[in-house]
């Protein structure tokens, strides 16, 4: 399969690599679309990802194959995934704070990502998509979830005035979420 592999500062190469083999708890996904995140751009400019890994974590695709212990998915399901892969066993995971996981893996940053024809991920970070959501639009699920999380953590209330710094994808999604949530002056 073809994949975009990060080698360092301003060094990403399209190469042919083997389709990943899955373990019993993993899902093999045929990637339909993969976005390029601001973190990918920063890594390209600075070289701060792990060399030799396939990049990409904002993606959508179709389940191609499931491991023997996978129960929630079948071949043909439309899916996306959380780019954070917590261990589920450390003190942070057990206290409901998986983003602080001591053993956190990150798709496309510490393990192979989705800017490829296929990606494999553990079942617990894969999510089914509704039929009415296109695979193209589903590439925005990751940035949208970050925005929703940030707004939910804030003290925002309808009618509040808000300041959004930055007009990239996250800023624009934040604008839409706040408008639809009843923000006053933006």
Where are these regions (language model features)?
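Mid-domain Rossmann-like dinucleotide-binding core that forms the NAD(H)/NADP(H) cofactor-binding site
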Residues: 133-186
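Residues that mark the start of a beta-strand
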Residues: 2, 26-28, 161
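Cysteine-cluster motifs in flexible loop/terminal segments that predominantly coordinate metals
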Residues: 37, 72-73, 82-127, 131
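Short Gly/Pro-enriched turn/cap motifs at secondary-structure boundaries
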Residues: 7, 18-19, 51-57, 107-111
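Cytochrome P450 core scaffold surrounding the K-helix E-X-X-R motif
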Residues: 39-45
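Glycine-rich beta-strand-centered segment in the early N-terminal region that forms part
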Residues: 20-34, 47-91, 130-132
């Amino acid at each position: 399969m073809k994949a975009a592999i990060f080698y360092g500062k301003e060094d990403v190469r399209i190469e042919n690599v083997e389709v990943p083999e899955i373990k019993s708890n993993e899902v093999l996904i045929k990637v339909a679309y993969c976005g390029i995140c601001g973190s990918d751009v920063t890594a390209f400019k600075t070289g701060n990802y792990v060399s030799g890994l396939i990049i990409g974590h904002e993606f959508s695709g179709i389940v191609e194959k499931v491991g023997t212990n996978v129960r929630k998915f079948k071949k043909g399901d439309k899916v996306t995934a959380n780019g954070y892969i917590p261990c589920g066993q450390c003190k942070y995971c057990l206290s409901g704070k998986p983003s602080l996981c001591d053993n956190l893996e990150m798709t496309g940053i510490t393990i192979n990502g989705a800017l490829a024809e296929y990606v494999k991920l553990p079942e617990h970070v894969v999510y089914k998509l509704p039929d009415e959501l296109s695979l193209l639009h589903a590439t925005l699920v990751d940035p949208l979830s970050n925005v929703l999380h940030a707004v939910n953590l804030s003290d925002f209330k309808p009618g509040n005035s808000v300041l959004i710094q930055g007009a990239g994808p996250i800023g624009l999604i934040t604008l839409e979420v706040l408008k639809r949530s009843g923000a006053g002056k933006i």
